[in-house]
A protein has these predicted regions:
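Short pre-functional
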Residues: 1-9, 117-118
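Alpha-helix N-cap/helix-start motif at helix boundaries, enriched for small hydrophobics
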Residues: 9-14, 128
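Conserved tyrosine-mediated DNA breakage-rejoining catalytic core shared by Y-recombinases
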Residues: 13-52
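Short, polar N-cap/turn motifs at the start of nucleic acid-interacting alpha helices
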Residues: 18-25, 121-143
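Short, contiguous acidic/charged loop-to-helix segments that flank catalytic cores in large enzymes
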Residues: 32-39, 55-62, 102-107
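DNA/chromatin major-groove-contacting recognition/catalytic segments
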Residues: 40-43, 48-50, 130, 142-163
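Short, basic (Lys/Arg/His-rich) helix/loop patches that form interaction surfaces
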Residues: 56, 71-130
């Protein structure tokens, strides 16, 4: 998720057949996103990750079980700062604003959002949108919590020509 920016529903469907080496020698994963039908091919930047998971592909796990394990790992990693967030109250079936350790609030979707947020200032928005399957820039920017101020394009242009 955090390395390739895909939804958990797409990650759990990856098989060895999805992985290939491109013309420049980089490992790629060819994915047709379930939600949008978009075809994306993110790069696997960290070969160690693929070395660890490749032998076990396809690795079937439910989204719920993945999220449970993710919370356990984050707890072990001491990602426990108290944060405000909305959590479903199982009795009332409504979301409530609560203060909880951060690991309790995290889910697989945070990995995807972190991918987009972490690369936002390093990779052109159009490339990130392609990899995450977003069609509208306004939706993408809202997704990662960035507002598009009136100088956004001018600043991006200046940054690009100064590089």
């Amino acid at each position: 998720g955090v390395s390739i920016g895909q939804r958990i529903s797409d990650l759990i469907e990856i098989t060895k057949d999805n992985i290939r080496v491109n013309k420049d020698g980089y490992l790629m994963i060819d994915i047709v996103q379930k939600k949008t039908g978009s075809e994306v091919s993110p790069v696997i930047a960290d070969k160690e990750i693929i070395d660890q998971v490749y032998p076990d592909l396809p690795y079937k796990i439910s989204e719920q079980k993945f999220n449970k394990y993710m919370k356990m790992v984050c707890k072990e990693a001491l990602i426990d700062k108290i944060v405000k967030g909305y959590k479903m109250n199982n009795k009332t079936k409504r979301k409530e604003l609560v203060n909880l350790p951060k690991y309790e609030m995290l889910s697989s979707h945070d990995l995807r959002r972190s991918f987009a947020t972490n690369y936002f200032d390093k990779v052109p928005t159009s490339i990130l949108m392609n990899l995450t399957g977003h069609n509208k820039e306004s939706t993408f920017l809202e997704y990662i919590g960035k507002s598009q101020d009136k100088d956004y394009y001018a600043d991006a242009f200046i940054k690009a020509i100064q590089s």
